[in-house]
């Protein structure tokens, strides 16, 4: 069965973005450190690089290694949309959970106006690669019962406030660390599976 994997960058205090959705405050380290980190993550998960950026990092023809589907909330979709990219991950099946986004925004993007849990349960039954939950926190909170794995890129910064990684009801859910890697730019990536 396919897995739902929440792959996301997080501050030390658990935020994925600032109060206005900003994420440009994440420290990258010096040029060499940032390049080494990005190369490592892009080699492992090339499909998580937006289609418009793939050529610039040498991933134009890179195959999808882990995911063939991306699921995101409107807050995660909006930055690309505002920049004119209506299909930010054209190399993946794209679903945007939103009650306000027009269903005809892009023919390659399926807008899901309700019940993301039912969607994920149906997608998991299909054949294919895993499903990447791109964000945001509200959607992750709603989908917590179906999240099988977490890949948390922990950055050495405290935001103070913003959009939490999970924004939902109190629901303690246990995960087990399966791998952890630290990079020279002080980012730590931890892989978790549901217990």
Give short role names for the model-derived ranges.
Residues 1-195:
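Enzymes that bind and transform nitrogen-containing heteroaromatic metabolites
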